[in-house]
UniProtKB/Swiss-Prot annotation:
Propeptide positions: 25-45
Tissues where the protein occurs: Expressed by the venom duct.
Family statement: Belongs to the conotoxin D superfamily.
Name of protein: Alpha-conotoxin VxXXB
Keyword DNA repair: no
Length: 95
């Protein structure tokens, strides 16, 4: 097989790894593993999450299963986001 044919064959097969067996697009995630995206892909779409849609210099957003506070997620449900002068945003959790 000539080199060009092999390259074209690889380029045709390579995109198939981005799709799962059911024919939908597989979640690729980032290097830490994007658990929330995988959960949403599996059908937890009715879970409401707070999200930052765009992050600087990145096409990815960030979603929280709890409250979104500044650029972070609060550790559990029931927290409120407060602003501390000179320290920025932080979560205030009961108990």
């Amino acid at each position: 097989m000539p080199k060009l044919a092999v390259v074209l064959l690889v380029l045709l097969i390579l995109p198939l790894s981005y799709f799962d067996a059911a024919g939908g697009q597989a979640v690729q995630g980032d290097w830490r593993g994007n658990r929330l995206a995988r959960d949403l892909q599996r059908g937890g779409r009715d879970d409401e999450s707070e999200c930052i849609i765009n992050t600087r210099d990145s096409p990815w957003g960030r979603c929280c299963r709890t409250r979104m506070c500044g650029s972070m997620c609060c550790p559990r449900n029931g927290c409120t986001c407060v602003y501390h002068w000179r320290r920025g945003h932080g979560c205030s959790c009961p108990g």
